[in-house]
Structure formats: structure tokens, C-alpha cells
From Swiss-Prot:
One of its GO terms (molecular function) is nucleotide binding. L-arginine binds at N22, N71, R90, R139, H168, D170, A258, C264. Changing C264S: Complete loss of arginine dihydrolase activity. The keyword DNA-binding does not apply. The record marks N71 as: Key determinant for dihydrolase activity. Residues 10-269 are annotated as: Arginine dihydrolase. It catalyses: L-arginine + 2 H2O + 2 H(+) = L-ornithine + 2 NH4(+) + CO2; L-ornithine = L-proline + NH4(+). The active site is at H168 (proton donor/acceptor), C264 (nucleophile). It comes from Synechocystis sp. (strain ATCC 27184 / PCC 6803 / Kazusa). NAD(+) binds at N525, A526, D604, S636, M637, L638, H639, D657, D680, V681. Bifunctional enzyme involved in a cyanobacterial arginine utilization pathway that enables cellular adaptation to nitrogen fluctuations. Catalyzes the hydrolysis of arginine to ornithine, with the release of ammonia and carbon dioxide. Then, probably catalyzes the conversion of ornithine to proline, with the release of ammonia. Is highly specific for arginine and cannot hydrolyze citrulline, dimethylarginine and other amino acids. Required for ornithine cyclodeaminase activity. This is Bifunctional arginine dihydrolase/ornithine cyclodeaminase ArgZ.
């Protein structure tokens, strides 16, 4: 027996499943056998007594879960951090455990009343005493970890639980002697699994399969080379034996009904202390402020969910609800993260939702100077599509050239900020790093949920369940907006792929160009080639556009077209020479509509007009979309995503594709101001032209007054 190891237990005199506070209790209320529970507890008690000293705390009537002493607190040396139970059903246990600790000479530390921490159920010392593994996500809060590190003077490693079946750390994680670890990886998020793998070498990690995990194999008591646990598989026993451990199985089925096993029924009150281990915690906290229709537009819920989904924790410090229907609300929220890296990721996404630091916190953003052309500092802030302001010389400065996936370069005299692509960074540029001192300016979503309505519409169409009537309704709205934009002198840009030509949409797109609904055309080599092929030879990719069947030798048509245009020197020259007499490119030339054809590695030819320098093509695209009010994206995922990344917030984007994944992909890239239409692009253009023709009178602002 190990005389230096003491374990606290509590007899199950009043044990029963009286309520449901975890998934294991569901369906088991009052279905536990008191007789079998006592029998199983006594067997566990006897098994532990053979290898350690067992102390007992007297059970209190009315608190059936007091038998699970692992949740009494966390002990190191003469100090104990008392538990703050998450559920009211267990909060009455706290004074009984506190009394026992004080009677036995421990110094008791108590967390704030509203900060849950459930003791050694969510905090497990490395068996070598090197650090403390601390769980959070269901019962314990991340913000409790700095207190624990301070009071127990130890390093705390935070792990986030994501499977509600494993609501406490000790249900899926068991540090073993010799630096080994018994655990169930799917119970943790990706970041926590990386942390575990960085701390524990592969040969020391013993992974538990789900069959053993749900039988609480990880909820085991380890005393030196002995592991006391519920019944487990032969495979797991062999793994443990290979690592040098002796497994002692004892059935604990009655306690599984309440979501506990061997470890839950025990609390080790003698933990190893290393003199060179001191308080260390990587947790970082920041306060953010949000304003707007936080509740009815779902902004606050979205922000809080974002924090949790990214391994963080939060506490709402202050919330002021708007008193009128049109009033805005405000909130101050403290956000905590297990590391600086995670905090930066969370803050980057919160900024996109309009979160800002309290005004008194920051005067200037952090910057680093570029030392190598075309290379940003490691921690540079990546811009988004939303209008952005940054703090320069203690004032908010509007960022110019707003677009996605760029760095922000600032100057102090005069104060300015602009988005710059990585390749355009110059030595000496001051680039913003981190996420402090930045905010996005987003339009306030009304209580009517205007933006949300569009998002729902987008999701409905992208789900692939739209009817033809639904498409027609969307086309009517799009046509009306296009008419307004044209008649008010606005700008509409079209990004189109060759499918427009293949589906018979060339005549309709030509009509839009001719009638002044297109002010710039973006695409690739293919749309121009097949448009000219259709205009001059009546085929597209060798298919007769009238009969819909391939023609003999049609597979060579596009190469003949490329060769002919190259002979003339370009598309404009071919139009002027009369070789091209109709089609999309013809109308662009005749109506002086600028276009850019961006090349790719698969292009045949290419046409002389095709820009094969990708950097120059991107720059030209960016120039042509400046000042756009609407962008039509017609069956070209690659070009559409590229354009979406260059487009600032506020520009209406209409994505048309037969594949729902394309419009979803566009949304995932951050192009949230989008309307998705899942339909054949040729049909869409036909409906659009018909609807525009029905709007016979020019839109006039005067007529509405």
C-alpha cells in the first residue's frame, strides 16, 4: 500500500438518480438499485484501500450526488479550491465539503459565486506533477483557470470539451503514472487535441475507442502502476498491460446511470508537488462592446456562439436593451480564450460582426514595418469586405481600397490607412498587426430583419428546393434593381463563364450589353472564344446551337476561331474587319464596354486579348469593379470567387449557377451580400431580359414624388 497517497470517498447512503443534469441520467430517474450501489461502492472502496489510504466524508441527506467526491474541489498540498457547482441540484454540497476540508487543516479558496468550477472532475494533475490539465465547456468556466493557477501555484493547461456525454474532463481523460495518458480524442476540440499531442509523445498516448469510452474507461483511479476501473474491453486491457499497468476491474453500473464511475467516486488529496513548477496560465481575456439590434437581428447570439465554437468563453458584463421598437441595444462582453492565438482568431471574427474595444482602451493600433518587399509581418491583420476603421493618432481613420484578403498599411502624418495586397507591400510600409484598435462599420439591421430576409432567401435557393416560380420572383426583383441602377447612372459588372454561351444565353447577354445594363465584363479566355464561335459558326464547343447536336469536326471550331482572331490581331480588330458581326464580345466593342479576359493554364491559344499575367489580370479586374453597384456572376465559380474577394461590402452580388455548391462556396468566402439563384443560366438570362423589356418606362425619381 502507498502510505503517501490519500483518497477521499463518500458512502452512498443517500445515493439515487433524482434529477437529470447530464445525458446519462436521462431515463434513469429512480431506477438505480440502492443495494447494488452500496455493494459496488464497497468493492471499489476495498480495492482502493489495498493500495492507498481512504478518508471518508459523511454523506448529507438530500444531496444524492455527494457520493461523487471528485467534484468536492481540487487539492494541491495544503490548499484546496472549493467547487462552484454549475447546477443548483449540487450546489448544496459545497458547505459540507468545505467543512471537511477545513476540519482536516486545508486552506480553502473560494471562487466567485457565478464562476462555475467542478473540482477534480474538471481538473486533473499530470501524475508527474508537471502541470494541471483543466477542462471547460460544459460544467467549468475557462475564467476559473487563472484563479486555480494563482492559488495552487501551478501551470494550467486548458482543454475544451465538445461532446456532452463527456461533460467532465475525468470522464474522457486520465493521466497515468510514468507520463502516460489514457484518453478519448473525439471528446475534445481540434485545438485541445493539438495541445495534448504537443505535451504527450505518441508512445505515451493510449487512445480509447468509443465502446470503452462510453463505459467510462477513462474514469479510472491510478495509483502507481495500478489502474482501478469499470469493466473494459480485452483490447484496452492489453494496451495498458503493454505499458506496464495492472488493471483491476470492478463493476460500477449503478453509478454509470448518474454519469460517473471510479474516478468520479474519489478525490485524491495528496498530489505530487514539484518545487520548480509555478503558476503559469496562457488564458487571455478582452472586453468588447457591441451596438445595434443585438437581439432581434440575432447579432449577440451569433457573437456568443462564435466565441464558444472557437474554443473561447464569455461573460456578459453589461447589457442595455433598447426601450423602443426601433431603439438599438448595447452590450459589453468579456471574452476569454485559452491562448493568444485563439484570442486573435476569435477577435478577427468578432470584428466582422461589429465588435469594438471600449473607447478608453486604445489610442493607436499596433504596427510592424515591412522588411522584405511583398512579405507582411507574421501577425498582420487580414482585411474583410466590410468598411473598416482603425485607430491612428487616437482617432478613427477610414480604410480605403476596402477588399478581402489584404494587409492594412497606415501612415501617421497625415493619418491614413489603405488595403494593400501582399505582393504590393514595399519595404518601410507600416502594416497593422493583431486585432486591437480596429472596427467594422456595418449597417444596423432593422427589427424587420431586412438583411436576414435576404440571407434566408439565399439559403433557400442554395438548398436546391426552389421552384420555377421562385426563380421568376427573384428575377423580377433583380430586373427592377438593374433598371434603377441603369437609369440613375450606376454601374453593373458581369462576370461570366462559357456556360452562358453553351446554354444559349449569348443573345440575352448581348441584349443586356446593347441596352446599357452592362458596364464592364469579366471572364476568361473561354467565354470570348465560344461567343465568337457561336456568332460566326453557329456552334459552341462544336455543338449546333439550333439543333443541340454535335457537328462533324466541331471539336476543332474553337481552335479555328482562336487562329482567326489572332490573325486579325485581337477582338476589336476582328469586329472592325467584319469577321465578328454579333454576340457578346461584338456588343462590348461596339458599345465601348471595357472587358478583361483572365487567362489560365488550360487555355487554348489564347486570344490576343486574354491577359496571361495573373497579377495584371487581378489588377485589371479590381479596376473594373471599382464603383460597381451590382455584380452579376453567371456560372463561373473561379472568376466569381475572385471577384467576390475584391468587392467591398455594400455591392449587391447575384450569383447564378445550376450547382447549389457554387453559390454556397461564394457565401463561404465572405461574400455575404449575395443573392443566389440556382437555375440554368440560359433560362435565367432569358427571364431577366423578358422582365426588363416589360419595364418599358425608365425609372424616374420624379414620378415617385
Amino acid at each position: 500500500m502507498a502510505d503517501d497517497i490519500r483518497i477521499l470517498m463518500c458512502p452512498p447512503d443517500h445515493y439515487d438518480v433524482d434529477y437529470v443534469i447530464n445525458p446519462w441520467m436521462e431515463g434513469n430517474i429512480h431506477k438505480s438499485s440502492q443495494e447494488r450501489a452500496v455493494e459496488q461502492w464497497k468493492k471499489l472502496h476495498q480495492t482502493i484501500k489495498e493500495c492507498a489510504i481512504v478518508d471518508l466524508v459523511k454523506p448529507a441527506k438530500g444531496w444524492p450526488d455527494m457520493v461523487f467526491t471528485a467534484n468536492a474541489g481540487l487539492v494541491l498540498g495544503e490548499n484546496v479550491v472549493l467547487s462552484r457547482f454549475y447546477h443548483k441540484e449540487r450546489q448544496g454540497e459545497e458547505p459540507y465539503f468545505k467543512a471537511w476540508f477545513e476540519e482536516n487543516g486545508f486552506t480553502v479558496y473560494e471562487l466567485p459565486q457565478d464562476l462555475p468550477f467542478e473540482g477534480a472532475g474538471d481538473a486533473l494533475f499530470d501524475r508527474e506533477g508537471r502541470w494541471l490539465w483543466a477542462g471547460y465547456g460544459f460544467r467549468s468556466e475557462l475564467d476559473s483557470h487563472p484563479y486555480i493557477a494563482k492559488w495552487l501555484d501551478t501551470e494550467v493547461v486548458s482543454l475544451r470539451l465538445i461532446d456532452e456525454r463527456f461533460y467532465h474532463l475525468d470522464t474522457c481523460f486520465c493521466p497515468l503514472s510514468g507520463g502516460y495518458l489514457l484518453y478519448y480524442p473525439p471528446a475534445f476540440d481540434a485545438y485541445s487535441n493539438r495541445v495534448i499531442e504537443m505535451r504527450i509523445p505518441p508512445e505515451k498516448r493510449i487512445i480509447v475507442e468509443e465502446l470503452d469510452a462510453v463505459n467510462f474507461a477513462c474514469n479510472a483511479v491510478n495509483v502507481n502502476d495500478i489502474i482501478i476501473m469499470n469493466l473494459v474491453s480485452r483490447t484496452l486491457k492489453e494496451k495498458l498491460a503493454e505499458a506496464g499497468f495492472k488493471v483491476r476491474e470492478t463493476p460500477l453500473t449503478e453509478f454509470l446511470k448518474a454519469g460517473g464511475a471510479a474516478k468520479c467516486l474519489t478525490l485524491r488529496v495528496t498530489e505530487p508537488i514539484l518545487p520548480d513548477v509555478h503558476a503559469t496560465v496562457s488564458i487571455e481575456s478582452r472586453v468588447i462592446r457591441m451596438e445595434g439590434h443585438l437581439l432581434d437581428a440575432g447579432i449577440l447570439n451569433q457573437a456568443l456562439d462564435l466565441v464558444v465554437e472557437n474554443s473561447g468563453s464569455f461573460r456578459v458584463l453589461n447589457f442595455n436593451l433598447g426601450v423602443e421598437r426601433n431603439s438599438t441595444s448595447s452590450a459589453e462582453v468579456r471574452v476569454s480564450a485559452p491562448s493568444h492565438q485563439i484570442m486573435e482568431e476569435i477577435m478577427t471574427e468578432l470584428i466582422d460582426l461589429g465588435a469594438v474595444p471600449p473607447p478608453q482602451e486604445l489610442c493607436d493600433i499596433n504596427t510592424e514595418t515591412v522588411t522584405q518587399g511583398g512579405v507582411a509581418p507574421d501577425d498582420f491583420y487580414v482585411s474583410t469586405i466590410y468598411p473598416t476603421e482603425v485607430r491612428v493618432n487616437c482617432e478613427w481613420v477610414q480604410v480605403t481600397g476596402q477588399r478581402m484578403d489584404a494587409a492594412i498599411v497606415v501612415t501617421s502624418n497625415p493619418p491614413s490607412a489603405r488595403c494593400v495586397l501582399l505582393r504590393d507591400l514595399q519595404v518601410g510600409d507600416r502594416v497593422m498587426v493583431g486585432v486591437e484598435g480596429i472596427r467594422t462599420i456595418k449597417k444596423v439591421e432593422s427589427h424587420e430583419g431586412g438583411t436576414r430576409k435576404e440571407n434566408k432567401e439565399f439559403a433557400f435557393m442554395a438548398a436546391g428546393v426552389s421552384s420555377e416560380r421562385r426563380v421568376e420572383l427573384l428575377v423580377e426583383q433583380i430586373a427592377w434593381e438593374m433598371r434603377q441602377i441603369r437609369d440613375q447612372g450606376g454601374k453593373i459588372v458581369v462576370t461570366a463563364g462559357p456556360v452562358v454561351i453553351h446554354t444559349g444565353g449569348a443573345q440575352h447577354l448581348s441584349h443586356l450589353v446593347r441596352e446599357g445594363y452592362v458596364h464592364a465584363l469579366l471572364g476568361g479566355n473561354a467565354i470570348a472564344v465560344h461567343d465568337i464561335e457561336q456568332a460566326t459558326m453557329g456552334t459552341s464547343l462544336g455543338v449546333d446551337m439550333q439543333r443541340g447536336i454535335p457537328v462533324r469536326g466541331g471539336h476543332r471550331h474553337h481552335l479555328k476561331i482562336i487562329n482567326s482572331v489572332r490573325r486579325y490581331g485581337g477582338i476589336r480588330q476582328a469586329v472592325e474587319a467584319g469577321f465578328i458581326s454579333k454576340g457578346v464580345m461584338y456588343e462590348c466593342v461596339k458599345n465601348n464596354i471595357p472587358y478583361c479576359l483572365a487567362g489560365s493554364i488550360r487555355d487554348d491559344g489564347p486570344l490576343p486579348d486574354t491577359e496571361m499575367n495573373l497579377v495584371r489580370a487581378q489588377s485589371r479586374y479590381s479596376e473594373l469593379i471599382q464603383g460597381a453597384d451590382m455584380i452579376l456572376m453567371l456560372s463561373s465559380m473561379l472568376h466569381s470567387i475572385g471577384v467576390g474577394n475584391m468587392t467591398p461590402s455594400g455591392v449587391k452580388m447575384v450569383c447564378v449557377d445550376i450547382n447549389p455548391a457554387v453559390v454556397t462556396k461564394l457565401s463561404d468566402r465572405g461574400s455575404v451580400e449575395s443573392v443566389g439563384v440556382v437555375t440554368d443560366v440560359g433560362l435565367f438570362l432569358s427571364l431577366l431580359v423578358r422582365q426588363l423589356q416589360q419595364l418599358t418606362r425608365p425609372y424616374s425619381l420624379a414620378e415617385t414624388l
